[in-house]
Amino acid sequence: MNPENWLLLRRVVRFGDTDAAGVMHFHQLFRWCHEAWEESLEQYGLTPAEIFPGSRKSEVTPEVALPIIHCQADFRRPIHSGDALAMELRPERLNPNSFQVHFEFRCEEQIAAHALIRHLAINAKTRHRCALPEGIDRWLEASGVGKIGSI
């Protein structure tokens, strides 16, 4: 299985993603990041029911929640309706209970934006830190970034 299949994704900017000036509104970038992360997990072979509480076809609520504890973005150039974007995801395990994903958005081979989203694994009932879910562990390992880093 080639990680490029789930770490390099594409999307076209839609009219509804832009503001009155026809430029992507800043908050859309984080929505795209989360959607790209979800798509990456699905392309890898994980179902939404394995990761996200409340998913359709989920017979059991996942024991682990993955709230976002930090996010940041840098915008390098305007993104317009109709632009074709290449989105590269670079997941990084930080420790046994957290990871982050770096996102790079390219348009016409130029970097349009960078973003980072950091997740923490917590027990869905107690809300205390816990180990990452097995599926996320597998996704991180298969993405070639299974090493432990510093937060």
From Swiss-Prot:
Domain of life: Bacteria
Molecular functions (GO terms): 1,4-dihydroxy-2-naphthoyl-CoA thioesterase activity
Associated pathway: Cofactor biosynthesis; phylloquinone biosynthesis; Quinol/quinone metabolism; 1,4-dihydroxy-2-naphthoate biosynthesis; 1,4-dihydroxy-2-naphthoate from chorismate: step 7/7
Matching SUPFAM superfamilies: Thioesterase/thiol ester dehydrase-isomerase
Pfam families given in the database record: 4HBT_2
InterPro entries from the UniProt entry: DHNA_CoA_hydrolase, HotDog_dom_sf
Catalytic residues of the enzyme: D19
Family annotation (CDD domains): 4HBT
Disulphide linkage map: none
Gene3D superfamilies per the UniProt record, alphabetical: Hotdog Thioesterase
GO-annotated biological processes: phylloquinone biosynthetic process
EC number: 3.1.2.28
Class in the EC hierarchy, top level: hydrolase
Catalytic activity reported: 1,4-dihydroxy-2-naphthoyl-CoA + H2O = 1,4-dihydroxy-2-naphthoate + CoA + H(+)
Function: Catalyzes the hydrolysis of 1,4-dihydroxy-2-naphthoyl-CoA (DHNA-CoA) to 1,4-dihydroxy-2-naphthoate (DHNA), a reaction involved in phylloquinone (vitamin K1) biosynthesis.
Family according to the record: Belongs to the 4-hydroxybenzoyl-CoA thioesterase family. DHNA-CoA hydrolase subfamily.
The protein's name in its UniProt record: 1,4-dihydroxy-2-naphthoyl-CoA hydrolase
